[in-house]
């Protein structure tokens, strides 16, 4: 199950052992995934700050 939440693109999987972003997933509160799924962050829609300036996105420090 793939869920887009704000700038994050999340992957919901049933096997928590397959989650490679477990630490990052813990920051997603509350989890948009069903309780029987683990939350994995696939990617963000915000480009990395070192690539170029990011405009219109406040508080990204």
UniProtKB/Swiss-Prot annotation:
Q: Which UniProt keywords apply?
A: Glycoprotein
Tissue expression pattern: Expressed by the calcifying mantle epithelium and incorporated into the shell's calcitic prismatic layer.
PTM comment: Glycosylated.
Reproduce the miscellaneous comment text: Seems to interact with calcium carbonate.
Please identify the protein, giving its name as recorded: Calprismin
- Which species expresses this protein natively? Pinna nobilis (Noble pen shell)
